[in-house]
Amino acid sequence: MTHPGKQRTVLLAVREGHVDSRLLTSALELCRRLEADLEIQVIAGGEAPPSEMDAFLNTLREERLPFSLEVKPTLRRRDLVDYANAHEHIAAVVIDSREGWEALAQDRSSDPWKRLECPLVTAAVHEKKHH
């Protein structure tokens, strides 16, 4: 099931161990505002998404919001950018934080987010630094 009219999709990239309710809520609200479908790509060790996502996935089903879910063992920043740029229906990419994805990067000298042709939404709650 997709929204009527021009197809738009929000791409949500989730890292196992970094599932934050604000991240999921941000993606959901963005989909509602844009009347967009939701495509979820999850980095996880197993074949199932992290259990912290169960309530969120149930909400999507209950509200009949169109979504797809793919669980992958690895996912690089560059892969997300290339994928989003190759699919013009991707309206935005939602991640927890640039810093979190930076930690996964093998080549930290590049910044593939700069090449992203749609908005990048970072939705993590920043921890306060104590001085």
Go through each PLM region and give its residues.
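Structural motif
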Residues: A13-G17, I43-G46, V71, I95-E99, ...
